[in-house]
């Protein structure tokens, strides 16, 4: 049984369709990331799951029980769902301990014991318990918000872009710590984000949302390497898209012959490669004949660790752009050999 099931969820504001027949299953203990651009409907979907809003159509099922089905509506505070908002939303007039323990019942000793357990769980030094929210770092504030959400022992944790306000290094470490914590506690979770890297690294199930619909749902590696369509492919990372002729498990394209992930397709198709699949080797003239594909570097856009290279394929004159790790041995006018690792992905007809 799934922890959460969404069936044909629909939502409109006046005449604008925000969510269009959303179906999603969240397995027990799993981490799901809903990723999409601003305005795609992902936060509205999260609020419907939490019970802050009601859908116009569909069903919300939590651990086999209807939270909403058109006749049944269970309010947010009775769903047993934890919620961590984007800014943490800590109570400024409560200490760290007061925030974590907000809503806990029982004796003062029981509350203190539970607060200490939660601080240990989210790797917060107990000496911070008497401090005010403004006296601790952004990463610590997010851990306090997570501990507060965990205090009620939720069956599902919802995370609404909780790392977006943190700097890059802190965001990565906090994200990893939260993912490990939720896995250890065997709590199913849903992260909403517009950051593709965050979604791919946090989740074991990624749902790409576009214009109120789920375009593709599946394991992160599947979505990255075999996306359902070109918009999903480009949204999840840098791509090289090529038109090719297919036959006998190969694509004949500007890069020569490339292996593909569907040996049965024939005819013209669009194929996709990720930049890390392409290896560039600087060549001397006497090495040209040994290369499967030759290209000339016509422009380099340096951006630190990554550079964007504009290459002209010598055999066809076609120009392509690829991103690669910046290297001192690459310069304008250089002839390079291109080698492809792995298979190109063929988009569905």
Curated annotation (Swiss-Prot):
Catalysis: reaction(s): Fe(3+)(out) + ATP + H2O = Fe(3+)(in) + ADP + phosphate + H(+)
Membrane-traversing stretches: none
GO cellular component, one term: plasma membrane
Matching PANTHER family: SPERMIDINE/PUTRESCINE IMPORT ATP-BINDING PROTEIN POTA (PTHR42781), SPERMIDINE_PUTRESCINE IMPORT ATP-BINDING PROTEIN POTA (PTHR42781:SF4)
Organism (species): Yersinia pseudotuberculosis serotype I (strain IP32953)
Entry keyword annotation includes Nuclease: no
Subunit and interaction comment: The complex is composed of two ATP-binding proteins (FbpC), two transmembrane proteins (FbpB) and a solute-binding protein (FbpA).
Pfam families: ABC_tran
Subcellular location: Cell inner membrane
Membrane topology type: Peripheral membrane protein
Domain ABC transporter as annotated: residue spans: 4-236
Name of the protein: Fe(3+) ions import ATP-binding protein FbpC
An MF annotation (GO) of this entry: ATP binding
Entry's family note: Belongs to the ABC transporter superfamily. Fe(3+) ion importer (TC 3.A.1.10) family.
Residues the record lists as binding ATP: 36-43
Function: Part of the ABC transporter complex FbpABC involved in Fe(3+) ions import. Responsible for energy coupling to the transport system.
EC number: 7.2.2.7
DNA repair keyword on record: no
Record-linked InterPro entries: AAA+_ATPase (IPR003593), ABC_SmlMolc_Importer (IPR050093), ABC_transporter-like_ATP-bd (IPR003439), ABC_transporter-like_CS (IPR017871), ABC_transpr_FbpC (IPR015853), Mo/tungstate-bd_C_term_dom (IPR008995), P-loop_NTPase (IPR027417)
Main location: membrane
Keywords: ATP-binding, Cell inner membrane, Cell membrane, Ion transport, Iron, Iron transport, Membrane, Nucleotide-binding, Translocase, Transport
